Amino acid sequence: MSRILFYGLLLICIFLGFFFYKQKENNIIYNRIVEKFEDNVVIDEIYTHLFKDSNLKELVFIKSQLIIPELEHKKMIKATGYRADAYKALSTVYRFDFKVHDNKILGFKSVIFEGFEDAKVSKHENNLPSEKWQQLKDFNIGDPNINEKFFHLEFPFVVKNTLCVTISKGFFKKIKKLKRLKIMLISNEDREYKIDIENFLPKYNL
């Protein structure tokens, strides 16, 4: 009996080891979060790439899907107007979050995707009404000066800055074709943070 229990525990350990290996394959940590409110569903698929040797600690890619059964009806899919158009624009949203640690609050005035230096960039706040997202060309980096009054301060602890970059469906399709993701962030202090990693996006059903 004890031998059967031992082999059973061993198989469980092997399975868990393989599971966590697959979850962290190529430095990518995968999470899936499903939230329900009333009859609606929000599904977030989150892919996190960890960095070890710089102030840039994480690159996080998030695909968010909003499912509203009422608007999924065939008649609504073909409909026009503010509500229908907003839902079409927001039902699937793609976003990169860049997490930078420093002893200061940072702003980021520029984001450059190598190969797409001429991309059309907007700089409006991420919480603006949905009609802004319908006008999204390539990607939005938010207002770089939203915390400007704090830029001069230095803190005796680590400040975890997050830059959220929302990208359009069309631009997502373009960067998905790249072999490598080469991205440069430029802060309000003209500090450059460079990323050069294998493009993990084509490996997943996004």
UniProtKB/Swiss-Prot annotation:
<comment type="similarity">
    <text>Belongs to the BptA family.</text>
</comment>
<dbReference type="Pfam" id="PF17044">
    <property type="entry name" value="BPTA"/>
</dbReference>
<dbReference type="InterPro" id="IPR031471">
    <property type="entry name" value="BptA"/>
</dbReference>
<keyword id="KW-0998">Cell outer membrane</keyword>
<keyword id="KW-0732">Signal</keyword>
<keyword id="KW-0843">Virulence</keyword>
<keyword id="KW-0472">Membrane</keyword>
<comment type="function">
    <text>Virulence-associated protein essential for survival of the bacterium within the tick host and therefore within the natural life cycle of the Lyme disease spirochete.</text>
</comment>
<protein>
    <recommendedName>
        <fullName>Protein BptA</fullName>
    </recommendedName>
</protein>
<feature type="signal peptide">
    <location>
        <begin position="1"/>
        <end position="19"/>
    </location>
</feature>
<dbReference type="GO" id="GO:0009279">
    <property type="term" value="C:cell outer membrane"/>
</dbReference>
